Amino acid sequence: MTKTRVWHRATKPEGPTQGLAARRAATILLDGVLRRKQPLDEQLEAEGGPLVDLDPRDRALARAIAGMSLRRLGSLRAIIDQLLAKGLPGGGSGPLEAMLVTGAAQILLMDVPDHAAVSLAVDQAQAHRATKPFAPLVNATLRNVARMRDDFRSILNDPSRDVPKWLHGRRVRTYGGPQALAIAAAERSEAALDITVKSDPARWAEAFGGIVLPTGTVRVADAGVVPELPGFSEGDWWVQDAAAALPARLFGDIRGKRVADLCAAPGGKTAQLAAAGAAVTALDRSRHRLQRLDENMKRLGFDVEAVAADAGAWNGGLFDAVLLDAPCSATGTVRRHPDVAHLKEEKDITSLAAHQSRLLDAAAGHVAPGGTLVYATCSLEREEGENQIAAFLARDSRFSRRPVAASEVGGWEEIVTDDGDIRTLPSHFPHENPRLSGLDGFFAARLVRSS
């Protein structure tokens, strides 16, 4: 049993209170991100993790509460701080803060009755030694949240509050104040399910009650449990954000060509390349992640060569095309992974950019004369995108940029930069239904090696 769950062990057997287990799990998940810096997906997938004993309904509720708490963390903290004149006992984050934040999220932002959110938070506090002395504080604070909800409108209506100051500041400097605010607003909505289909996007969109994006991605607002959806077990489609599906499209016709997909797991782009008829070598340094890729390829019916190796040190020969989706800060994926904004620090960007530079040089060494190299990251930071490509082209004269035309990405001019690269933002693709809006923030550039 990991330390993450120690404080959640009840001092006496848990009673039958309906919904308590889901709230406790949500509190564990939030505390794991904020205090222990454990990614949300890592906690969800961990053997013996907080959701392991929950039924599907409670699992979904726990994830929803934790996700909402992370998306609106800045606002919720500001409200709690306003109500606690002396601050949190103990001086900061911990299980008590997680209980208050998840409780406030339910009261202010979710379709949960006030009395249920308050009483279950108090039950949590009373059940555990570390927080039992503060049960009256939990009760009073959350009752005040419910009673004073109209007083908090100005806080809740400012999207910038929910982005760490360092990150929002970078966005303002890079994209300007209005666009930074639009990005923050887009990240407040949970991302829809995006899928890449092998054929006939319109048919699948109709089957799922979704829409087809300009690039052919099918988007579904309320899909349900993914493995239970039609066509999943048959391998007719795979989950992949619309922005993440763009880089592999930039190679054009690759039928019969040898293509290396570096840093490939979990395999969405690998699947695209294989579906396009390429002979694909998929590389990843993580054997665990590579196993997941292999499972995905088997489900989809694609035959690819999977190699466990470090892309920076691999000696795999030359290829007609190389795709490098480099490890990055992932600041473009906050709408889909709300924990990212609270796990990363500004200093991480410098070290990641240096690593990307080394990987880019290594990837270039695998491109045959006349071949194509596509570099991509799911980051909004220029150091990991535009600046990375400018520096690479300055030091390697063998390569030049081959600009992307809007016609190659469904006529979507908004996402093509003046240099001919791809730059998507979370605020792109607005839709009347917020659940169908937005994209992951992505950067991609296409380079060709001289013959």
Can you annotate each of these PLM segments?
Residues 1-451:
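S-adenosylmethionine
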